A protein has these predicted regions:
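Catalytic cores of carbohydrate-active enzymes across secretory and cytosolic contexts
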Residues: 1-181
């Protein structure tokens, strides 16, 4: 992807984020974390997500969860719920800075939408290395062992990197190009 097309892509992403934040009535100045929770989410993963979301309350982030499952157990001031539909899924993919990837989620779709995944080990995701400035996501462990502490640690790494626009842009670019191989 050329420099101009990357600029255009990032501008569209910024506009999508602003529109979603306006629609859900919160500021767009903080990192936006997306989460797609579907019926395929195992109970152990659901429990890890609940604990993970509790931890996000102490961070300056907004979380938008698109879900087709019962969400009565989730209640946090910085977490916004949207009923699952193809349109809401598309909107969250286009708007999110970061997405928490569960084993049932589509990694390629995240990368193609310029989303930085917080992901279990996956063939499409290379753990970001700040020293060599390589990678396209932040890895938290194996798909069969979803641990909320490891997810949270990967999120903190991502949020620290988010503060550096040049590095963040490079991770997005790496993710976009990794889907075209």
């Amino acid at each position: 992807m050329g420099e101009e097309s990357l600029k255009e892509f990032l501008q569209k992403k910024t506009n999508s984020k602003q529109e979603l934040c306006k629609k859900l009535s919160f500021e767009h100045g903080t990192p936006l974390i997306g989460l797609v929770i579907d019926n395929e989410v195992e109970d152990s993963h659901r429990s890890a997500v609940e604990r993970f979301l509790e931890g996000t309350c102490s961070l300056e982030v907004e979380v938008v969860a698109v879900a087709d499952t019962d969400l009565d157990s989730f209640s946090h001031p910085n977490v916004h719920y949207v009923p699952y539909s193809e349109k809401s899924r598309k909107n969250i993919m286009e708007a999110s800075d970061i997405m928490v990837a569960l084993p049932s989620n589509d990694m390629e779709e995240m990368l193609m939408n310029g989303v930085i995944p917080i992901s279990h080990k996956h063939e499409l995701i290379n753990n970001y290395n700040p020293n060599s400035e390589t990678g396209n996501g932040f890895v938290y462990g194996n798909a069969n062992e979803v641990d909320h502490w490891k997810m949270f640690a990967a999120l903190i790494r991502a949020l620290e990197t988010y503060k550096f626009p040049y590095d963040w842009r490079n991770i997005i670019s790496t993710g976009l190009t990794s889907t075209h191989k």
